[in-house]
A protein has these predicted regions:
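Catalytic core of nucleotide-sugar-dependent glycosyltransferases
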Residues: 193, 205-229
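Membrane-interface aromatic/basic loop that binds lipid-linked glycans or pyrophosphate carriers
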Residues: 2, 26, 220-243
Length: 243
């Protein structure tokens, strides 16, 4: 089994090296690391270039994108792995055995796998954990999934397409809802932490919260019509647990 791990970055020279090293420390080695850089100008690209000289597993794309999701799509389209994982700049794996663990639990019959997400401060001190239980993936349970922890079969993208770049901050919500509607979708949950995410990312910053609410409302209305308020309230009440 081969993984394609995608990192999107722009002007994050402080954190990008620790993210790269988190992947390099993994015990499991059958992966490629695709870094999509939105034309960083702060020295990020020099750090990535230095890492490439030392390790040949990195595929580097440097190009201006409209948003995070267009950058993710660029990476997914060139990915050669069986499964696509995400490791945003500033984030890291919970330990050096995450990919090894995922490899033992996943198979070509599984469409999507996810686990728990740890929120941390800038010094990576644990603040809270996004843990949950899902037996069957459906439009009514998809909101529980911690998107940064997902490993998604490349076949899924070929089946339903990529992230919708019209959404600038909540396209993962739209994507997971589309995935959940696939007939007989095969989902596996690992009830343990996979990713440590620094608080202050695209959708965890207070300055972005209203945009997130607007896009979520739009996505939920498209998917649930007049029941969207009820389903959206369920999501909000669920997320309050982790704040």
């Amino acid at each position: 089994m081969k993984f394609s791990i995608i990192t999107v970055v722009k002007n994050d020279k402080i954190n990008i090296e620790s993210t790269i090293n988190s992947l390099l420390r993994q015990n499991f080695s059958d992966y490629e690391h695709i870094i999509v850089d939105g034309n960083s100008s702060d020295g990020t690209s020099e750090i990535i270039t230095r890492a490439i000289r030392n390790k040949k597993k990195i595929i580097y794309i440097r190009k201006k994108d409209k948003n995070l999701y267009q950058a993710l799509n660029r990476g997914i389209k060139i990915a050669k792995g069986d499964y696509v994982g995400i490791l945003h700049s500033g984030d890291k794996y919970f330990n050096d055995k995450v990919l090894e663990l995922v490899n033992t639990k996943i198979s070509n019959k599984i469409d999507i796998l996810s686990g728990f997400l740890i929120y941390a401060d800038n010094d990576l001190n644990k603040k809270r954990i996004w843990n949950y239980k899902i037996k069957n993936l459906s439009p009514y349970s998809a909101f529980k999934i911690a998107h940064p922890t997902t490993f998604i079969s490349k076949k899924i993208f070929k089946k339903i397409g990529y992230y919708n770049i019209l959404y600038t901050i909540a396209s993962d919500t739209d994507f997971l809802l589309r995935v959940s509607k696939i007939p007989n979708i095969s989902f596996t949950l690992l009830q343990r932490p996979l990713i440590i995410m620094r608080i202050g990312g695209l959708s965890t910053s207070f300055s972005k919260i209203f945009r997130k609410i607007y896009e979520d409302f739009k996505i939920y209305f498209v998917n649930f019509k007049y029941l969207f308020i009820l389903q959206y309230v369920r999501k909000i009440l669920y997320k309050i647990r982790f704040n």
